[in-house]
């Protein structure tokens, strides 16, 4: 073990979007901050080269993990082939095969940048519809922090347009949405005849130069990497924090936490890649890892005072794991659509995000994937044995006519959807892999039956042929639950400020604290919650 003990006012574990935004806000307000991440620093140009040199078959299957090599001391998920980092069991194990990245910047290196606000009713699902759980706060309490997050991240949205249902706003989006490309425009016109409202997706992507980053130029490569940096990434906040004095330590795998007689956290220990142990002390500690790694660490760090895990007196750490179970459809449209103009996700059908039906079945988001079809078209045309002019013509035809649509569903928190430490798999440092048991439940299955018909209606309206629909639920990497919030320490892990009930100086700035999944991407809500937690931390340390 190293003889040196590191120290700071605040130690943050996890340098993804939540941890980095939190670090920047705290250091900007005069606190000393140490920001740790299990993974390495990553270089954008190298990621681009990794993507360029990937096998075509990986690209056609939307392999977004391989450009980010997993390191032995901090493995993350990769399914090409499956590295068995995340073990998933249960009837819907396909629905929880999450894609995560470890490293400074986190998984926002490869996201679509969709930055939705949740609806007011998402915060009071149980009070309104009698199902699920309520958040420990209202939408109105989080609204100022939503705007703070939007400004930090540079979110563009449909200023001046009316969207139903929508989240009330006190201020306009920092930037106005880019215009649709041909594919989204055509899709919008067609589904409007079905009574569906296809509206612009708020995105953390620049429609004009913003905060030192360039305007999006439509590379359509947001996943796995924006080559020019127009799309927001948690690494930007990490760099800002570092310039103001925060210290970033990559390749730091936290494995233990010490507590005193009052059960306050007094120190944490981390391994470096050589398995040398290092100790860190602070006044306040924050775990800002993703919704898988946060409960995993809390369980791993069990000690004599907390034999079932840190912050786990309720036995809810690792329970209520959520995402947005998805179903997808692909087909060839009768008329050219030419997906690929602009970013990968420009629009979404919002009609089914809220309503009285939520007392019986899940709300949904239906969307059009604007990812260019040429890679998939090329692989399909080659599999048909075509050569020469016929091959070229078939690739062009499929690229023009290929359509991908999807339906994502909210899922209710269920304590049986649980993460535990694997007894069978360990990484190079001897740390157990996470293991999740997952069942989406009848609430989702009932909704999915309706969604499948809606997708079929869209395909029919577009003259679809070669229709393929996923027969199982797919993940969306919107990891929520696992350390759920609430007022009562007996049935929740954190309070409305993300402070753990068991440890007064430990906060969890992560999507794992979210009490309901809603229907849309969770990143903006995670960011807003983290920025709100920063105010609680600042107030604590100001009072001494």
From Swiss-Prot:
SUPFAM superfamilies: FAD-linked reductases, C-terminal domain, FAD/NAD(P)-binding domain
EC numbers for this chain: 1.1.5.14
Active site: 478
Residue positions binding FAD: 14-30
pH dependence: Optimum pH is 4.0.
Catalyses which reaction(s): keto-D-fructose + a ubiquinone = 5-dehydro-D-fructose + a ubiquinol
Biotechnology (record note): This enzyme is commonly used in a number of research projects to examine the electrochemical properties of enzyme-catalyzed electrode reactions, named bioelectrocatalysis. Available as a commercial product from Sigma Aldrich (catalog number F4892).
Cellular compartments annotated: Cell membrane
EC top class named in words: oxidoreductase
Transmembrane segments: none
A GO CC annotation given for this chain: plasma membrane
Similarity field: Belongs to the GMC oxidoreductase family.
Species of the source: Gluconobacter japonicus
Main location (coarse class): membrane
Function per UniProt: Catalytic subunit of fructose dehydrogenase, an enzyme that catalyzes the oxidation of D-fructose to produce 5-keto-D-fructose.
Protein name: Fructose dehydrogenase large subunit
Gene3D superfamilies in the record: FAD/NAD(P)-binding domain
One protein family per Pfam: GMC_oxred_N
Gene Ontology biological-process entries: fructose metabolic process
Gene that specifies this protein: fdhL
Requisite cofactors: FAD
Keywords from the UniProt entry: Cell membrane, FAD, Flavoprotein, Membrane, Oxidoreductase
Subunit structure: Heterotrimer composed of FdhL, FdhS and FdhC.
């Amino acid at each position: 073990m190293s003889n040196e003990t590191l120290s700071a006012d605040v130690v943050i574990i996890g340098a993804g979007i939540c941890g980095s935004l939190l670090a920047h806000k705290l250091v900007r307000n005069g606190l000393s901050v140490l920001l740790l991440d299990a993974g390495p620093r990553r270089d954008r140009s190298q990621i681009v080269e990794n993507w360029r040199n990937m096998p075509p078959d990986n690209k056609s299957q939307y392999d977004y993990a391989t450009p980010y090599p997993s390191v032995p001391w901090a493995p993350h998920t990769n399914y090409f082939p499956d590295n068995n980092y995340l073990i998933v069991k249960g009837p819907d194990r396909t629905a929880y095969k999450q894609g995560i990245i470890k490293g400074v910047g986190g998984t926002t290196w490869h996201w679509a940048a969709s930055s939705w606000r949740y609806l007011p009713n998402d915060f009071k699902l149980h009070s309104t519809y009698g199902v699920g759980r309520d958040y420990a706060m209202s939408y109105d309490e989080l609204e100022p922090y939503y705007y703070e997050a939007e400004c930090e991240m540079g979110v563009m949205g449909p200023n001046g347009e009316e969207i139903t249902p929508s989240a009330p706003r006190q201020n306009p989006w920092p930037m106005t949405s880019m215009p649709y490309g041909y594919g989204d425009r055509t899709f919008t016109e067609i589904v409007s005849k079905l009574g569906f409202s296809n509206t612009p997706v708020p995105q953390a992507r620049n429609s004009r130069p913003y905060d030192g980053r360039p305007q999006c130029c439509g590379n359509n490569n947001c996943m796995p990497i924006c080559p020019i940096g127009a799309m927001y990434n948690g690494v930007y906040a990490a760099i800002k924090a570092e310039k103001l004095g925060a210290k970033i330590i990559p390749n730091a795998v936290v494995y233990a936490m010490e507590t005193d007689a009052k059960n306050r956290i007094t120190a944490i220990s981390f391994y470096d890649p050589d398995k040398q142990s290092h100790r860190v002390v602070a006044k306040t500690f924050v775990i800002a890892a993703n919704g898988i790694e946060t409960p995993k660490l809390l369980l791993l760090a069990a000690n004599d005072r907390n034999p079932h895990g840190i912050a786990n007196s309720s036995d809810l750490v690792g329970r209520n794991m959520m995402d947005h179970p998805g179903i997808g459809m692909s087909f060839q449209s009768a008329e050219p659509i030419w997906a690929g103009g602009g970013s990968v996700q420009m629009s979404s059908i919002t009609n089914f995000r809220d309503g009285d039906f939520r007392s019986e079945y899940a709300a949904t988001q239906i969307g059009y994937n604007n990812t260019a079809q040429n890679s998939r078209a090329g692989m399909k045309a080659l599999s048909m044995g075509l050569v020469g002019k016929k091959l070229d013509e078939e690739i062009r035809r499929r690229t023009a006519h290929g359509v991908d649509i999807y339906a994502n569903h909210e899922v209710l928190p269920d304590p049986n959807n649980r993460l535990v430490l694997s007894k069978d798999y360990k990484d190079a440092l001897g740390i157990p892999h996470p293991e999740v048991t997952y069942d989406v439940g009848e609430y989702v299955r009932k909704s999915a039956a309706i969604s499948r018909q809606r997708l079929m209606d869209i395909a029919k309206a577009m003259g679809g042929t070669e229709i393929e629909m996923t027969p199982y639920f797919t993940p969306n990497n919107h990891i929520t639950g696992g350390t759920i919030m609430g007022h009562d320490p007996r049935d929740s892990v954190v309070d409305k400020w993300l402070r753990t009930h068991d440890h007064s100086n430990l906060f969890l700035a992560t999507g794992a604290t979210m009490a309901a999944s809603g229907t849309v991407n969770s990143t903006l809500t995670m960011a807003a919650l983290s920025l709100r937690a920063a105010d609680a931390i600042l107030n604590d340390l100001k009072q001494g």
